[in-house]
Every structure is written in structure tokens, then in C-alpha cells.
Amino acid sequence: RCQYCHNPDTWSLTGKDAQHISAEALVKKLSRFKPYYGDRGGVTFSGGEPLLEKDFLLEALIRCKQAGIHTCLDTAGCGDGDYGEILRYTDLVLMDIKHYTEEGYRKVTGMDFEASRRFLETVQQMNVPMWIRHVVVPGLTDGETHLEGLKTYIQSLKNVERVELLPYHVLGVHKY
């Protein structure tokens, strides 16, 4: 898990508050709110990591597109590598770049960078618009050298429409 996950309360799929819902039922609920989305709104699939529930995600994305709902995927790009079909139904990717080097990525997440790298390659190949997000964590991702390297890395990507540097915060830390 990422060192600075802001919602560990969502990890359990069996807790007392866990609810199972079909993609069909979800999109039916979402469709009721379509008038509130306006011209620029829609649905954002986030997590945790939405790519870890790829079958549900794909069905929900397809149903959203059939209902005329704009779709956004908020992800760190960690899944099984079968991204093309999911991205066919994704209007915008909010890409959380945890780190831009293999070593740094492993330090932040404890995971291999390859899945995220493959996801980014597919996003670029499919030319899906992308907003980059990066959490600036004191002592971890806030150094000048790191930020310069991140800038160079982001400049190597295409179809990036926006870059957001997000401040690290400790809101909710008392809960965990």
C-alpha cells in the first residue's frame, strides 16, 4: 500500500458497512443525478485502486457511456495490464504518479513500477486525456531534485492536460 493512503477505511470488502452492488444498479443510480453533472461533470471511479476491480469497472464504464455519462478514472495505474478495453470507455484519466523512478516508486508503495508504467504507455497510445496528480510529501517527494526529475518525466508524456501538486496532510490521522 502507498505510505500516505488517505482512506484505509475503504480496504475491507467484508466490513459491516461494505455493500455489494452490480454495475447495472450503480449506473442506474448515477443516471438519476445526470442533470446535476452539467456539461463538464460525470462519474469518477477511484479507490483505493479501481483497476483492481477490472471486470466491474469495465461493465460500469460501458454502462455509463451508454447512458451518456462522462467517465473519469482516478488511478495509480496498478492492475493486471489489460487496460485497453477499460480506456476505450474512459474520457479522462487522473493519474496519480507516486514516483517517477523504480527505486522511488518501490520506496513509496512497496510495489514494482512496471504496472504503472504499462498503464501510462497504454493511456498515451490510446490518446486519452490525462491530468497528472502528485502528492508532495515532506522528506519523501518534496526535494528540489525530485521535483525537477518529476517535471522532466511528465514532460516526456503526451496528452497531459493538467498537472496538480497536492499537499500532503494528516486529516483523519486520528482515525487510523
Feature-to-residue mapping (PLM):
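Short microdomains enriched in Cys/His and/or Lys/Arg
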Residues: 16-32
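Canonical Radical SAM [4Fe-4S] cluster-binding loop centered on the CxxxCxxC motif
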Residues: 1-20
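Short acidic/His/Gly/Ser-rich catalytic and metal-binding motifs that mark active-site loops
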Residues: 172-176
